[in-house]
Amino acid sequence: MNISLIFANELITRAFGNQGKLPWQFIKEDMQFFQKTTENSVVVMGLNTWRSLPKMKKLGRDFIVISSTITEHEVLNNNIQIFKSFESFLEAFRDTTKPINVIGGVGLLSEAIEHASTVYMSSIHMVKPVHADVYVPVELMNKLYSDFKYPENILWVGDPIDSVYSLSIDKFVRPASLVGVPNDINT
């Protein structure tokens, strides 16, 4: 099973969301990367992330929502599968050959990082401060920097001084020997 995390956050504060939306303006290059990376894959998210998705093209992706409270009525017209827990999703998809991309929220990212072989993290630096009510937890960042190889920068856009924003997308790869190994064994 090939599991990746793909998420964006503000570089300095680690802001992740604000009132169910991204805390920064739309960044074309980041959205293009996200769409290309998640195409023809299984996209896993929590309920709030599902509700926050724009009405974008959802073709070429299998959507999974992890929620113990969502109802079938809420998603009747959408092409998604619902699982009560990330563990039940893993069990059901254990033999899949499709790439799996976990996109949020932060609780699900924190749980899924234990199973991930790759993390794509977009770090956005805004010249003006952003407002947020959800942040990437320090524990998730610590896990990322302790269990994964030093990142490879795969995209850089903008200038942090002369632009409204700069964007850096980094790819972290976990050494194969640590994929799926609980954190207490890694130390």
From Swiss-Prot:
Q: Which GO terms describe its biological process?
A: dihydrofolate metabolic process; folic acid metabolic process; one-carbon metabolic process; response to antibiotic; response to methotrexate; tetrahydrofolate biosynthetic process
Recorded catalytic reaction(s): these are: (6S)-5,6,7,8-tetrahydrofolate + NADP(+) = 7,8-dihydrofolate + NADPH + H(+)
> What enzyme category does the UniProt record give?
oxidoreductase
List the Gene Ontology MF annotations in alphabetical order: dihydrofolate reductase activity; NADP binding
**Where does this protein act, in terms of pathway?**
Cofactor biosynthesis; tetrahydrofolate biosynthesis; 5,6,7,8-tetrahydrofolate from 7,8-dihydrofolate: step 1/1
Q: Is Oxidoreductase among this UniProt entry's keywords? A: yes
- The residue ranges of the DHFR domain are 2-174
What does the record give as EC number? 1.5.1.3
SUPFAM superfamilies per the UniProt record, alphabetical: Dihydrofolate reductase-like
The protein's UniProt keywords, in alphabetical order, are:
Antibiotic resistance, Methotrexate resistance, NADP, One-carbon metabolism, Oxidoreductase, Plasmid, Trimethoprim resistance
Which protein family is named in the record?
A: Belongs to the dihydrofolate reductase family.
**Additional detail:** Confers trimethoprim resistance.
Output the NCBIfam families linked to this UniProt entry: trim_DfrA10
Its biological function?
A: Key enzyme in folate metabolism. Catalyzes an essential reaction for de novo glycine and purine synthesis, and for DNA precursor synthesis.
Write down what this protein is called.
Answer: Dihydrofolate reductase type A10
Species name: Escherichia coli
User: What is the name of the gene encoding this protein?
Assistant: dfrA10
